[in-house]
């Protein structure tokens, strides 16, 4: 995310009308599609009691704005996350179609900063959740920001309140999940003006700093899910299934904030690395319970971002919807590596802990390719053997 400018953009009445008309449209088959590793079946409308609560999801930016490493953008990542949150909400809960709105649902729609809050205000949203990732840092951390400032040494949250309460769920849920893979921690769940202007006991501007918090008429929060300028995170951001994990952490937080139970969904995920140098391995075939997953390769996806076949590696795999409490045999196979077989028992989600829905199984594989002796090494060895005879 770039720091949002303190201005009100020109509002497009057409954009607002289009968004309001689109709110009742069901999720498309393409949006809902998952590959063979997703759950074979899930209980429809498992969570009831959504009521008339209106949720507005704001995948930050538009198109391919805020490009990170290798050209993959923040706008693309957060759109995928928002669409997956929508998928989980419509799959697991009885949320009415007219009570969920996204400010954009494809990579072509352009929504200005000011339009986002105006659409939410015109629609009458009860909560505004803005999804972002960050840039330009050396440590891969999260942060959640709700509207607030300091008055005479006292922190004040904007009204209607609720952003802080939502962040108290989302921040640990998202951070603990991401720490399993590439994140190092969090910068906190913060009043936005206090975050950008720390150390002041009495802010002169007593209103939220971020536009989405300042201009929205409802409780709101903006999250930063790691840094798209850090390689370890960005190589995961490119992976389709990894983003489903971030989406589920947000989905789980939304349910907790709204006072609803969390579904007992499960995920098995991990990173497969070379045992000698810890570099993630591309093209590993992972098999469990008759399902297979092959880690990303240059041919499958990385060619979209680089001509260097050896530049990007994530070694990430994920299976969704395995049976909680059951022990599975997991096999890892890759050309040039010894096959690895592991036993894993799937944790049961829905117990309230931040990452109890994901069972993490990281694996190291050993390269079995024969050692290559250079011409120099060969000549040196012959000289040594010859001299040892005398």
Ranges and model annotations:
Residues 56, 130-140, 146-149, 186-262:
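Active-site-adjacent mobile loop/cap segments within catalytic or ligand-binding domains
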Residues 325-336:
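A short, solvent-exposed beta-strand micro-motif common in secreted/extracellular proteins
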Residues 3-15:
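Bacterial N-terminal signal peptides that target proteins for export
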Residues 35-160, 164:
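Catalytic-core regions of hydrolytic enzymes
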Residues 318-320:
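Hydrophobic core positions of the immunoglobulin-like beta-sandwich fold
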Residues 288-316:
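Short, acidic Ser/Thr/Gly-rich low-complexity loop/linker segments typical of extracellular
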Residues 340-376:
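Extracellular beta-sheet/turn segments enriched in Thr/Pro/Gly and aliphatic residues
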